[in-house]
Amino acid sequence: MDKLQRDGKEDTPRQRRFLYPLLFQEDLYAIAYDHYFNRSSSFEPMENSSSNDRFSFLTVKRLISRIRQQNGSIVPFVNCDQTQLVGHNRSFYSELVLGGLTAVPEVPFSIRSKHSLERMNEWTSFRSIHSIFPLMEDKIPHSNFILDIRIPHLTHPEILVRTFRRWIQDAPSLHSLRSVLHEHRNLIISSNLDQLILIASKENTRLSLFLWNYYAYECESLLVPLWKRFSYSRSLPYESFIERTPFYRKIEHIVIFYHKYLKKSLWFLKDPSIHYVKHRERSIIALRGTYLLAKKWRYHITNFWQCHFHLWPQPYRIYIDELSNNWFSFLGYLLSVKMKTSVVRIKMLDDSFITDLITKKFDPIAPTTLLIGSLAKEKFCDISGHPISRLAWTGLTDDDILDRFDQIWRNIFHYHSGSSKKDGLYRIKYILRLPCAKTLACKHKSAIRVVRERFGSELFTKSSPKERESIFLSFSKTRSQRERIWHSDIIQRNPLINSCRKKHN
């Protein structure tokens, strides 16, 4: 694969035209087999695997020879009868073929993405989810409106085939990809990435994720260059005539672009305060201006996607929120901009007067109601917050029970440490403390009062006092209760559900 990427980097047009012969390379299916085996071994023990799942390169050679003699696409192999596979599992070889079809377009796509990142040296990418919030904390208070964008639905496989056709000129590869997409429509037709992964896990998660990432990349590739040109454009210098100043001020805030897909010029009001962040299927655009300007941006984005993908993206999937009056939910936080008024005394020579200074402040809050709903979903409490004991954990030792509740609380507090208000987090801690006490009481067949007398009122936070002291004393002594901390090691969006699933409850 490295050699293919080096060859493609030297002669990209030639490499785009001859992708189909890669499907007849045995090494490609070896790569697909390794991926299939590694993914399967993590879910299924080796002794439980079927003998039909044993890979045979001799069978692959025979099937490749049979395909070459048919002068057809890969579909007869995918849909062939199980008896034609010399006694081997049909779904297993179908998985390998899908893996091969995934590896083929990944080669030019990875080269294209790498070149795009090399050209954008001023763009920085971080793995941590919390790296988004310092940017928003610095930039969003200077904005007036938020465009909350959901990526449009993919309703037909031909939309992806048309986008692939723009940069892959190998017709047999496109026909093979078209046949697979029509055969496995569940790989792409979904409006939610989590739902897409759940559906595709029964078929081929790698192919579905590649198609989703490619589709999201295409959605952004049309808009990001325009935003960059729009943000980095500079006004022409003009002479400062008093009577002509309003006229020149109007001219300098207008930028004209010609778009090759729309075949016409686009007029925008220039404003350098445009910021863009994206996570999974959601994108956030923060801009400074009027409500009319936000509606124009929504109109242009809708037209861009309609002309580029030949589909109708619903305008209601682009929400407009005014930061001064509303909050919006993003990455597990409720985000808003608060107006802070300060009384300032200004002294000028022999005179002084008092005035109000209004500043904008980024205000992220942990959603207590949503966190209680997540606890209720994992059976720690009901929807109103009343505790429920974990009967499945009563067979564990006391230390294991305390450690599990302690780890869940630490993950929640670690992720939402950027919240400006910690009261909701301490309420979550109180709710978790009661299920912990009830679980220990059920195990020892005693009352909750006896458990609290034995383990103390803090219960699970007593299991590691040093780390608890380092966390809470930092807030009580050296830092304010409203100070925010963003961590660079957080890569998961919902630490509660992930930590619960790791415990195999």
Swiss-Prot record:
<comment type="function">
    <text>Usually encoded in the trnK tRNA gene intron. Probably assists in splicing its own and other chloroplast group II introns.</text>
</comment>
<dbReference type="GO" id="GO:0008033">
    <property type="term" value="P:tRNA processing"/>
</dbReference>
<dbReference type="GO" id="GO:0009507">
    <property type="term" value="C:chloroplast"/>
</dbReference>
<keyword id="KW-0150">Chloroplast</keyword>
<dbReference type="InterPro" id="IPR002866">
    <property type="entry name" value="Maturase_MatK"/>
</dbReference>
<dbReference type="InterPro" id="IPR024937">
    <property type="entry name" value="Domain_X"/>
</dbReference>
<dbReference type="Pfam" id="PF01348">
    <property type="entry name" value="Intron_maturas2"/>
</dbReference>
<comment type="similarity">
    <text>Belongs to the intron maturase 2 family. MatK subfamily.</text>
</comment>
<keyword id="KW-0934">Plastid</keyword>
<dbReference type="GO" id="GO:0003723">
    <property type="term" value="F:RNA binding"/>
</dbReference>
<protein>
    <recommendedName>
        <fullName>Maturase K</fullName>
    </recommendedName>
</protein>
<dbReference type="Pfam" id="PF01824">
    <property type="entry name" value="MatK_N"/>
</dbReference>
<keyword id="KW-0694">RNA-binding</keyword>
<dbReference type="GO" id="GO:0006397">
    <property type="term" value="P:mRNA processing"/>
</dbReference>
<keyword id="KW-0507">mRNA processing</keyword>
<dbReference type="InterPro" id="IPR024942">
    <property type="entry name" value="Maturase_MatK_N"/>
</dbReference>
<keyword id="KW-0819">tRNA processing</keyword>
<dbReference type="GO" id="GO:0008380">
    <property type="term" value="P:RNA splicing"/>
</dbReference>
